[in-house]
Every structure is written in structure tokens, then in C-alpha cells.
Curated annotation (Swiss-Prot):
Gene3D superfamilies: Ribulose bisphosphate carboxylase, small subunit. GO terms for molecular function: ribulose-bisphosphate carboxylase activity. The basic functional RuBisCO is composed of a large chain homodimer in a 'head-to-tail' conformation. In form I RuBisCO this homodimer is arranged in a barrel-like tetramer with the small subunits forming a tetrameric 'cap' on each end of the 'barrel'. Keywords: Calvin cycle, Carbon dioxide fixation. RuBisCO catalyzes two reactions: the carboxylation of D-ribulose 1,5-bisphosphate, the primary event in carbon dioxide fixation, as well as the oxidative fragmentation of the pentose substrate. Both reactions occur simultaneously and in competition at the same active site. Although the small subunit is not catalytic it is essential for maximal activity. Heterohexadecamer of 8 large and 8 small subunits. GO terms for biological process: reductive pentose-phosphate cycle. Signal peptide: none annotated. It holds the Pfam family RuBisCO_small. This is Ribulose bisphosphate carboxylase small subunit. HAMAP family: RuBisCO_S_bact. The gene is cbbS. It comes from Pseudonocardia dioxanivorans (strain ATCC 55486 / DSM 44775 / JCM 13855 / CB1190).
Length: 141
């Protein structure tokens, strides 16, 4: 099951050239970028691990792509995403966010139903990947 989070999630994975074009677009709009990674892509897990610090002063698309590739190399079985931030409204908001790397296999989610008070049904999603230990969720074995 392909995780669909962020901009471009329904498109095929981007090449480095296409990622560079998006980086250039963000930098042209004065949006600083950051790289994040996780092995728990649950839709409510909005706080992924940061790769280094946000690149507020980096103006070169090649430098940002170098950080993306360093994160990919260090976390080959994780989801990696690139975020661009817009502070033009007086607060830091996400202007662009998209996944630049996925594990080879994405096991998907299970929907759990539970009956509550007054026979109200509550729903919870559970990632099959989280049944394995952190750091071992997308490796073969």
C-alpha cells in the first residue's frame, strides 16, 4: 500500500532532477527547507525526526539535494520527506511538503473498530510496520 501524504503523493516517485526543480521553486519563493525521516508514517505522526537543522541560509538547490541524499544514505529503509516553510504571514507555516524516499515495501494499515458508550463506533488505524521494532520495520527478515 502506497502512503499518500503531502504534496505530489499520488504521482510516481520524483527523480533527483524533479526534486531539484521543487527545491529551486521553494528557494525562489524564499521558503527555507528541512529534511525529515521516519519509520512510522501514521497519518497522525506529524513529528518526524529532523535531519540536521532547517536550512534557513542555504540558497543552493544542489546543497539541499546533498542533504536529502545524505539522509537517504543514512536511512535507506525509512520514509524521507522535504519540507518548505513560509514565514511571510508572520508565522512559520508549511508551504510545501513531499516524500522523497519510501521503503521498498510499504505494508499498509489496519482499521480497528471499537464499540464505545451508547454503541458509538470508534475507529483507529494501526500501521503493520509498527509491529516490528524501531529501526527494523522495513528491513528484510
Amino acid at each position: 500500500m502506497r502512503i499518500t501524504q503531502g504534496t505530489f503523493s499520488y504521482l510516481p516517485d520524483f527523480t533527483d532532477e524533479e526534486i531539484t526543480a521543487q527545491i529551486n521553486y521553494a528557494l525562489t519563493n524564499d521558503w527555507p527547507l528541512s529534511v525529515e525521516f521516519t519509520d512510522d508514517p501514521h497519518p497522525r505522526n506529524t513529528y518526524w525526526e529532523m535531519w540536521g537543522l532547517p536550512m534557513f541560509d542555504l540558497r543552493d538547490p544542489a546543497g539541499v539535494l546533498m542533504e536529502v541524499n545524505a539522509c537517504r544514505a543514512a536511512n535507506p529503509n525509512a520514509y524521507v520527506r522535504l519540507n518548505a516553510y513560509d514565514a511571510s504571514l508572520g508565522r512559520q507555516t508549511t508551504a510545501l511538503s513531499f516524500i522523497v524516499q519510501r521503503p521498498a515495501e510499504e505494508p499498509g494499515f489496519r482499521l480497528d473498530r471499537a464499540e464505545g458508550r451508547g454503541r458509538a463506533i470508534g475507529y483507529t488505524t494501526h500501521s503493520y510496520a509498527t509491529e516490528r521494532p524501531v529501526g527494523d520495520r522495513y528491513t528484510q527478515g
